[in-house]
């Protein structure tokens, strides 16, 4: 249940309107949370190659969403980078 409550709080803090659950901003925030969790898992389980592959897919998907956000809404892109402590 902890993951679900974290996810709901994250969606509430990044959503653009009342029913927003799938905008690029929310997707980037959720992917960042999953990436952090999976990175911690992989530090303890170095031989978990399937999780490493999943991590690489998530990082690539987040990168593409951030590129889209930068292309369409540069202000929100910069805000996302600062709020999530991402470097670009």
Swiss-Prot record:
Its keywords, alphabetically, are: Ribonucleoprotein, Ribosomal protein, RNA-binding, rRNA-binding
Which GO-annotated molecular functions does the record name? rRNA binding; structural constituent of ribosome
Do the record's keywords include Secreted? no
How is this protein annotated for GO cellular component?
Answer: cytoplasm; ribonucleoprotein complex; ribosome
What's a GO biological-process term for it?
translation
CDD domains from the xrefs? Ribosomal_S15p_S13e
Tell me the InterPro entries matching this sequence: Ribosomal_uS15, Ribosomal_uS15_bac-type, uS15_NS1_RNA-bd_sf
Which top-level group of life is the source organism from? Bacteria
- By its UniProt entry, which Pfam families does this protein fall under? Ribosomal_S15
Please report which protein family the annotation says this sequence is part of. Belongs to the universal ribosomal protein uS15 family.
Assembly and interaction partners: Part of the 30S ribosomal subunit. Forms a bridge to the 50S subunit in the 70S ribosome, contacting the 23S rRNA.
Q: Which NCBIfam families match?
A: S15_bact
Q: What does this protein do?
A: One of the primary rRNA binding proteins, it binds directly to 16S rRNA where it helps nucleate assembly of the platform of the 30S subunit by binding and bridging several RNA helices of the 16S rRNA. Forms an intersubunit bridge (bridge B4) with the 23S rRNA of the 50S subunit in the ribosome.
Q: What is this protein called?
A: Small ribosomal subunit protein uS15
Q: Which organism is it from?
A: Methylacidiphilum infernorum (isolate V4) (Methylokorus infernorum (strain V4))
Which gene is annotated as encoding this protein in its UniProt record? rpsO
